[in-house]
Amino acid sequence: MNYTLLELVQQVTGELGVSRPTLVIGNNDPQIIQLLALVNRLGRDLSRQYEWQRLNTEYSFTTVQGQEQYALPSDWLRQIPQTEWDRTSQWPLIGPATTQEWQIYKSAIISDGPNLRFRIADNFLEVDPPTGDLNLSFYYISKNWIDAGGGVTRYTYAADTDKAIFDDSLMVTGLKVQWKASKGLDASFDLAEFRTMLDTIKAQDKSAQKLTLGGLPRNILLTEWNVQDGSFPS
């Protein structure tokens, strides 16, 4: 179970040897106000660091005939590449298109094809051609790294009971680094510990594919690689 905001700040202040607060949100102590600002920045920075499995989110919607632009989810931080699919036709979307390619799609005499093309521009997912009644789906990384309970997530701490999704030790060490740096203190030891911890937690965050040092597995089926050029058996 992860620390609440209050527990996190109490742990950090205890390790730093400064006064431990009884509340964080609504506290008028400049030290606590600064720690709150720093921990919010820390969480946002960590969100951008990696494809965290707890921030991995699926989104789907149905297209409308003639509509080209569809708003991205409100908590969208970044796209997970090559997850864009047309589930109705069971085809992947083609893209993301560059601006030059998109101009070709919109302007060329012949530009239509059987598959939808897409790009992300101005916080919209744009599709071409604008076909209706298709169920489109993709995965993205959410910017909401705070669990407020009851299925509610946030981008910024709003209550002392809010919890970050990140490892407690990582948050404690990272917050100590930021606090010491803001005070002009030597944070080199804590920074080295934070970087090592971050690499370890990234590696443990989700599963991994099996790697082999041998050659590729042989295909027992007939393919272009194992069919003779001529003189086929009668």
Predicted regions and their residues:
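Glycine-enriched, solvent-exposed interface loops adjoining structured elements
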Residues: 1-234
